[in-house]
UniProtKB/Swiss-Prot annotation:
This is Small ribosomal subunit protein uS17. It comes from Streptococcus mutans serotype c (strain ATCC 700610 / UA159). HAMAP family: Ribosomal_uS17_B. GO terms for molecular function: rRNA binding; structural constituent of ribosome. Keywords: Ribonucleoprotein, Ribosomal protein, RNA-binding, rRNA-binding. The keyword Ribosomal protein applies. GO terms for biological process: translation. One of the primary rRNA binding proteins, it binds specifically to the 5'-end of 16S ribosomal RNA. The gene is rpsQ. GO terms for cellular component: cytosolic small ribosomal subunit. Part of the 30S ribosomal subunit. Gene3D superfamilies: Nucleic acid-binding proteins (2.40.50.140). Transmembrane segments: none annotated. It comes from the Bacteria.
Amino acid sequence: MERKQRRTLVGRVVSDKMDKTITVVVETKRNHPVYGKRINYSKKYKAHDENNIAKAGDIVRIMETRPLSATKRFRLVEVVEEAVII
């Protein structure tokens, strides 16, 4: 039996204070069903970061996985773009 394609999302790391866990905010745009105006939606996901490589401000790709804790359902795949430190 073949496994389904897992969902991948790209977002920005907003917190890396927990050990082996990052909080990623994923922003999407959708049209309002009646008025047609573009509306920004954002949702936060907790993701598993085994080696603590992602830092706050990084753009990362996360992938859906089995439940790793009460709130973690995603894991870090790669750091797409590192944050610029000023």
